[in-house]
């Protein structure tokens, strides 16, 4: 059949050239034979009814034929479309293929064609519907999308990193929520019994951390400079204040403090409750606790004057001479001893002994021995008094006059007199410098300088003094002289120390070398860690406070370290609220605080404000800037609010980056679709469609996010930083596929149902790619990481919306643009017409030529002369590839190249080498995800985490015992064994006895009971108890003994002393606590020794009831505590340097926990390591499961849509190769395997379909040999696939500008690599494999032909019910032009809807 574009004799005319996109395919040996373009139909060949048979298969075919065959007629299309059909029949119309198979003209995969026919008919109907109702479709779908967008107002961005990371519904989630769930179940209402230890929630919780890193490479942190710098930073933190609710708050207000010993209400010390609360220091874990300077930051803050102690402050001679109570000169044990001598402290005194509260910091060495306040008890104390005169002399010699410090006039009081008298009466310790021989110390007389005014008043001699009186007078004179010397030394002490610091080179003129101030060996002092003010219970392992500690030999003392770390424990909001809540009989703890507005919410606001300002203050500290003003970050703070605040800030949509990314995509889409005519957009240009396509995809993405919000899917960093760009890049792929086929279909359809044909021919590829993309992200939700589940779920929803939009709104817009083209209006500037509109004929817009006009041979030339120019102009842009275009390169260079056998072998060898390299990369791949990578660069939390990963391998953990169905009383030995088994792990820090370094509640309770038993035994020896009746008969029984009596009498709900007092032991010889009264003892220990309870970090729930010891021993029943539903044992882990080691430690400790759970002691571990690395135990299994599921899904989807398992298998094989190569690439470039990279591997399977399925579908639908079909497939789809690849690349390009390192590393880099790998495998390797092993074509003409002829037109009555005959505009009706054929068949041919007898020697030309 001829077309009006090619009259007889003009086919090979050089002026006509290649007139469609198959015209040059003779270069690829794909052009059909010229005689095959025409077919003469005989009436006898028209469809004969198949005789029904009993064959079930035949009957099924007949049933399917009834609905899927015979709905399309070859008369509906022009010759150009028929040319396309003959080369790739099933691509164009599976119905016509089945008609030819029924006629016996072809054989093939009937099942695939039935499936294809069904899908094509649905798509055809969709295209027709959209074309007829374009504006209605746009309005309706847009309204639905707009309703979905309404959900965006409910967006919630999740910033809790634990909720983002911990798998929901899994073992870890159950363990983290065990305590809240058990509290909810038991509904226990707790009173004001005291603060709970701040619970760590993964990255801090109640822990605020500071890391100090070296100022330059190689700096030793265990030197005076870094240590003193840390002291100053700690002082800065301790004195840092924020104003909230009109009140200033410092760290001491919100820090965690162990509860002070309880004081009975009738005690003389009860009025000192507020003072004791202020004196008890904050618990912080710091390396400077090894030294006296550690006390400087303890305060108290604000300063606590002695006057707050009332008369006691004046009477206590053990207090320092200053007006303020400070830990830097406070000797706790001296004060306690003095108070104990006056007021019997009872069990509280033994508590201080057990806790190791001795001299506080007074006996610890000084970092700087030239500090004027360095106490005499320090081992490197330097006494400057003997050298004061010499210092003054030498200083004056060099032009410096030491400044005398004026003595403060503090007045005089009676209490001061008493206090001083007591001090004078006491013996003062005589301090000897370590390097100074005792006999070399000058006597006081010798040390007093001549200019010191010494009292020389003669002793009255009116009476003769006895020898004793003379000696007393002499002694008094010496003391007077010593006091005067002390005052003199004190007045110049500070200035003398300052001069010595600045003039170390002058020391030889002042003193001999052996008397120089001596620095201690800092590394030796810090070996084994440091201790807080209670040295027996507050121990800080060196791995916790020192970064990368070094030793000269294993087991020896430290030789150095790289960093210092301090940890501040911050109380819970409930504790802060109770701390400042007005208490009966007590003064307000915070002046100016509005008690009416004071509640837990207000306390939480105080905590958050302080923590935020703490981080900001240290991050901008002057220590982070060098002398030249350049950033030199050495202080790295982290507060529990830091990560949440940072995530909330950076998880917001960055509209600048988003707009830039979308503008770049718009520019690319417009440039690729632009066609110009006289510097104006041509009619065949599609810039408007490209612009509309990007906007449609954007609108669909926004609507998808809105629906995701309706579904309750929370936003996170992946949502805001990745999803907009990734879905844009993937979503526009289908847009480019539609636009690429749009031009061809418009020319091929000949004005008949263009949109329906476009959807029918392109829809299959869109279905395959879109469904697989959606499924791949849905499969990603199998990974149990909430943040990644949200990301995958949102991506799948957005891709679904993109899919809907690309099948509804976008075709409707194309339909509107089609009318523009038919009207010959220019693109974008629709008010202008194309230059050729008036004088030319278009395939789309045809002049109204008389339908019955007969064109004879003599007028052929004149007719073609009229249309030849427009034909050349319209076809130049798409039919014949433009010179130097990508399509031209593909057709004329690339396809011939890959068709050569040598090239195929080279490609296979190269791809095998690439695959081999990927296997090497996979072997090098390691597990892990640096927590710093998931946070934005140049933020305080990210810098902190990187410093922590570099310098520290220390993590705290807890072993949690799950009640309440545990019999603690009878399972004590098992609990001890459980703790010992965990402690035996090589990762647990141990003490010198090879036991876990941290004491735990059962051991501390046991020690307390033993001390109580010891006090009881002493009273029994004195006869203070009647062991028969169990009564107290002594008059002055110690508090410990009375407490032991109450413990022995209380057992369960009973109180009976007879037969128990003196007969039972609170703790037996094997260390087992008496089981009868175990829960009674637990109550007593919790209330009496509760400071040890808090130190033990036991976190009991439910907490034991309140109880206090009464003076009436008959009223001392101790109520039993409820069985514990929750308790925990602390451990410290070290050596956790990387993910592999951490995972091994988790496995080791988990195995112990599981073993004891099987033995009847339910338990689980908890801590940072378990929270963030637990998923690595199951990552490989989850990854393999997800990849298997998506691979099977892809196989099933392609098999169902194409009904060709062999084609699906080839696609899956290529996808498998791509996944392996991507995994190998990540291993080679050092991208670790973790849940984030696992998502990219899973989605790579679905995204990889974009590079393969288009080629396979085109290959299946083409005719010819495998090589010819491969060449045809590459020629047809290479350009749109490349456009899709570049659009995806442009979409993810903006990810490279994200502040999040994990976005850049795990999405931008990996996705870019995926695109490159996809192009290599989909457009280079796959064509080679298809040319060798490709699946059989879906249909094969009989008789060995390489083209398939069309079936005869359907009878009018058979064709009347088909859609499409009147679906297009009026301009689409066939023109009815008739011309002579070059052959004169005896039959009549009809075209379009106008079928009639034309004559024996004529035939009607189809619409063009």
Swiss-Prot record:
List the membrane topology term(s).
Multi-pass membrane protein
Q: Which residues form the SSD domain?
A: 654-816
Q: Which intervals lie on the Extracellular side per UniProt?
A: 158-649, 708-709, 787-795, 923-1175, 1260-1276, 1327-1408
Query: Which stretches are Cytoplasmic in the membrane topology?
Result: 1-136, 671-686, 731-765, 817-901, 1197-1217, 1298-1305
Where does the UniProt annotation locate this protein?
Membrane
- What are the record's GO terms for cellular component? plasma membrane
Q: Is Cell division found in the keyword set?
A: yes
- Extent of Low complexity compositional bias: 1387-1408
Q: What is its main location?
A: membrane
- Which segments carry the region annotation Disordered? 1-20, 455-479, 1342-1408
**Which residues bear sugar attachments?**
599, 1026, 1036
Molecular function via GO: hedgehog family protein binding; hedgehog receptor activity; smoothened binding
Q: Which InterPro entries match?
A: HMGCR/SNAP/NPC1-like_SSD, SSD
List UniProt keywords, sorted A-Z: Cell cycle, Cell division, Glycoprotein, Membrane, Mitosis, Transmembrane, Transmembrane helix
Tissue expression notes: Germ line and its progenitors.
Q: Return the Pfam families for the record.
A: Sterol-sensing
Give the transmembrane ranges. 137-157, 650-670, 687-707, 710-730, 766-786, 796-816, 902-922, 1176-1196, 1218-1238, 1239-1259, 1277-1297, 1306-1326
Q: Where are stretches of biased composition, namely Basic and acidic residues?
A: 468-479
> Into which family does the record put it?
Belongs to the patched family.
Miscellaneous comment as given in the Swiss-Prot or TrEMBL entry: Membrane proteins Patch and Smoothened form a receptor complex that binds Hedgehog morphogens. Despite the lack of Hh and Smo homologs, ptc-1 is still found to be functional. Absence of ptc-1 leads to the formation of multinucleate germ cells and sterility.
Q: What does this protein do?
A: Required but not essential for cytokinesis of mitotically proliferating germ cells.
By what name is this protein known? Protein patched homolog 1
Q: Which organism is it from?
A: Caenorhabditis elegans
